[in-house]
């Protein structure tokens, strides 16, 4: 007997495109050393104590603490926010999904400011919300007037990445406050906070509609373990704690985060190195007549190609073992994004780009 399983699938997901993730290094065909500059990871890796803890840990057969008590205690110390207001998850992606599940009824509207992090739209679509795009201006700054004009009675959430991914654009606290003053629940995604030092945490008592997301993927070298956290008003944290998966942070990630927080000064030193290297990379990229780099407050630099095709450059770099991200979406046509690595990674990238321009 033949069954048509498709007829049982949600009709709104029939054309769902999914997310295009970065290529795994083991899938790259090259004889060269892989230099991974496509996913904004910390190429210095996790703290040595994390790696040592992982090699000696012997509790993998035990379920993790569903409340993430110790992680939240350490994060409360780090952020200055009460641990009851902290929710942890399997990456900040999971928290984005949870927020949309909590706030969105089918047809409710979510304000998105493209070009920006794709997961805001991804999870809004998945949760049957309606994405209302308010495009950024030519310099990739948020259009605050456009956000105000886009508000309707159906508006339930606003997402703002600060700084923005994939453009690296910063947004001032004053501009964020203008958005918060609209009174709509607003998510400020501080995934790259450690690279810029600007946070809205101290504004939380003044804005009960302010929610902040962060991650251990970018600064802490734990991208492969998938750990993120959010800082929420008490009432929202309470609801999220009820609907989240009970074991959303696995026991290996739990142990790694504890060690990272105990060794955070070590990791923050690597952040300083990356910020210094970002300045050098921006200066050097500016010397190429066929590249237009944009200022960045994160750990990557976006470049628009003024000559040639970004896809061709991406493929040429990949053939040499250098992985970078290519974009061709609206307002991102013919763009490449370079993660900032170690000095030797920058040297290899600049050498390869220089040879292409000859």
Swiss-Prot record:
Enzyme class, UniProt record, top EC level: transferase
SUPFAM superfamilies: PLP-dependent transferases
GO molecular-function terms, A-Z: histidinol-phosphate transaminase activity; pyridoxal phosphate binding
Record GO biological process: L-histidine biosynthetic process
InterPro entries, per the entry: Aminotransferase_I/II_large, HisP_aminotrans, PyrdxlP-dep_Trfase, PyrdxlP-dep_Trfase_major, PyrdxlP-dep_Trfase_small
Keywords per UniProt: Amino-acid biosynthesis, Aminotransferase, Histidine biosynthesis, Pyridoxal phosphate, Transferase
Keyword Transferase (UniProt): yes
Reactions this protein catalyses: L-histidinol phosphate + 2-oxoglutarate = 3-(imidazol-4-yl)-2-oxopropyl phosphate + L-glutamate
EC code: 2.6.1.9
Cofactor field: pyridoxal 5'-phosphate
Metabolic or biological pathway: Amino-acid biosynthesis; L-histidine biosynthesis; L-histidine from 5-phospho-alpha-D-ribose 1-diphosphate: step 7/9
N6-(pyridoxal phosphate)lysine found at: 218
CDD domains in the cross-refs: AAT_like
Listed HAMAP family: HisC_aminotrans_2
Subunit composition and interactions: Homodimer.
Family: Belongs to the class-II pyridoxal-phosphate-dependent aminotransferase family. Histidinol-phosphate aminotransferase subfamily.
Protein name, entry field: Histidinol-phosphate aminotransferase
UniProt lineage: Bacteria, Bacillati, Chloroflexota, Dehalococcoidia, Dehalococcoidales
């Amino acid at each position: 007997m033949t069954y048509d399983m498709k007829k049982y699938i949600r009709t709104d997901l029939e054309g769902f495109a999914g997310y295009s993730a970065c290529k795994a290094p083991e899938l790259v065909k090259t004889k060269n050393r892989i230099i991974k500059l496509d996913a904004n990871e910390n190429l210095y890796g996790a703290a040595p104590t994390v790696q040592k803890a992982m090699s000696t840990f012997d509790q993998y057969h035990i379920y993790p603490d569903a409340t993430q008590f110790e992680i939240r205690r350490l994060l409360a110390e780090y952020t200055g926010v009460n641990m009851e207001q902290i929710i942890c998850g399997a990456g900040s992606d999971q928290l984005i999904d949870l927020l949309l599940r909590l706030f969105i009824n089918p047809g409710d509207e979510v304000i998105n400011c493209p070009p920006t992090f794709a997961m805001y739209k991804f999870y809004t679509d998945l949760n049957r919300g309606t994405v209302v795009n308010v495009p950024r201006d030519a310099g990739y700054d948020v259009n605050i007037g456009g956000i105000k004009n886009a508000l309707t009675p159906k508006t339930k959430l606003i997402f703002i990445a600060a700084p923005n991914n994939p453009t690296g654009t910063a947004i001032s606290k004053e501009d964020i406050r203008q958005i918060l003053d609209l009174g709509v629940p607003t998510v400020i995604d501080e995934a790259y906070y450690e690279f810029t030092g600007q946070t809205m945490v101290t504004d939380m008592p003044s804005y009960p509609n302010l929610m902040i997301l962060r991650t251990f993927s970018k600064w802490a070298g734990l991208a492969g373990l998938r750990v993120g956290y959010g800082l929420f008003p008490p009432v929202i944290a309470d609801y999220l704690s009820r609907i989240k998966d009970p074991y959303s942070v696995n026991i290996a990630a739990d142990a790694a985060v504890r060690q990272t927080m105990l060794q955070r000064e070590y990791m923050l030193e690597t952040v300083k190195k990356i910020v210094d290297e970002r300045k050098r990379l921006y200066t050097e990229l500016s010397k190429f007549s066929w590249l237009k780099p944009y200022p960045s407050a994160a750990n990557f630099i976006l470049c628009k190609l003024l000559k040639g095709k970004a896809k061709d450059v991406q493929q040429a770099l990949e053939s040499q073992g250098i992985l970078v991200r290519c974009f061709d979406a609206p307002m991102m046509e013919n763009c490449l994004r370079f993660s900032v690595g170690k000095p030797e990674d920058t040297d290899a990238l600049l050498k390869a780009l220089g040879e292409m321009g000859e």
